[in-house]
């Protein structure tokens, strides 16, 4: 299995997705493309493949400035896949949710995910 690197588009409508087999997963930028599924699906598939032989620890760093409703569903899919690995004790998963000091919307979004996903979250401003 190889690392996954999905670069943002030149218009800044898709996020950087940089997933390392070592267990460090990064999602950064903005996610506002209407058909964002095409951008996120390789990441979901990659995580599902990783679950067959995961590293002992996985850290998901989410540093998004903004994301739309379609993106939120894809983020939830990623979190659910990681939750499965965590609950089955295949890997210890931690989510670091970054938000700007004055960005209460992103803080609320992180809290919403934290309330429905059984993973440890660190809210970092």
Task: Describe the role of every protein-language-model region.
Residues 55, 85-90, 116-122:
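Structural alpha-beta junctions
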Residues 43, 62-113:
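Amphipathic alpha-helical interaction surfaces in cytosolic regulatory modules
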Residues 23-26, 56-61:
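Glycine-rich, often proline-containing surface loops adjacent to acidic residues and nearby aromatics
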Residues 32-57:
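Short, well-structured hydrophobic secondary-structure segments
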Residues 2-5, 9, 111-125:
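A cross-taxonomic marker for long C-terminal extensions/tails that follow the last structured domain
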Residues 2-41:
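STAS-typified acidic loop motif
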Residues 21, 40, 104, 115-118:
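Non-catalytic terminal and connector segments of soluble metabolic enzymes
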Residues 59, 94-96, 120-122:
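Structural preference for beta-strand elements that scaffold enzyme active sites
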């Amino acid at each position: 299995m190889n690392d996954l690197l999905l670069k943002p588009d030149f218009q800044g409508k898709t996020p950087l997705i940089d997933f390392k087999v070592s267990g460090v997963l990064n999602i950064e930028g903005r996610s506002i493309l209407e058909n964002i599924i095409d951008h996120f699906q390789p990441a979901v598939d990659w995580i599902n493949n990783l679950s067959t032989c995961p590293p002992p620890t996985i850290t998901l760093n989410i540093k998004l400035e903004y994301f739309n409703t379609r993106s939120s569903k894809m983020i939830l899919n990623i979190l659910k896949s990681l939750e499965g690995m965590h609950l089955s004790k295949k890997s210890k998963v931690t989510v670091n949710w970054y938000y700007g000091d004055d960005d209460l919307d992103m803080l609320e979004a992180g809290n919403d995910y934290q309330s429905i996903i059984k993973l440890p979250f660190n809210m970092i401003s």
